[in-house]
Amino acid sequence: MRKAAVIHDLSGFGKCSLTAAIPVLSALGVQCCPVATAVLTGQTGYPCYHCTDLTAMLPDYIDAWGKNNAHFDAIYSGFLTGAEQISQVLDFIRYFREEHTLLLVDPVMGDDGNAYPFFTPGLLNGMKELTLETSIIFPPLYLLLSHQNFYCFP
């Protein structure tokens, strides 16, 4: 069975994040090893949500999984809370990537043509750095990286 580290948030309400990724990948025969970046009451598109950032835990995953000799066929990152998390995801990738490891990034920057309020230029620069390490980039990051005039991003 193939194994994937799935680095994403856990949203209690909304069809997204780990609650969507785990069943889809599992149905495809992939064992999911979740790495929670944050726990949210609901996804960020709702007018009211609360978020607990789990940035401080990410180095613990690298430490514990490294000591347990973990190996992954894929590493997939989704919602990240900021530049520090991006740096830690890069550390995770550099630690666990092997020659065959597929790297996927879904930058989770906004919905319906609107950027999320927390999405800053610093976060964009971190996403650019993260995508240099990846095999597959999900939209809409290609719009920002290509510097095209896209109506929701300056």
Segments predicted by a language model, with ranges:
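Residue-identity detector for glycine
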Residues: 12-14, 29, 42-45, 66, ...
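Conserved beta-alpha-beta core of the PfkB/ribokinase-like small-molecule kinase fold
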Residues: 77, 83-154
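Small-residue (G/A/S/T)-rich helix-start motifs and N-terminal tracts that mark the onset
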Residues: 1-73, 148-154
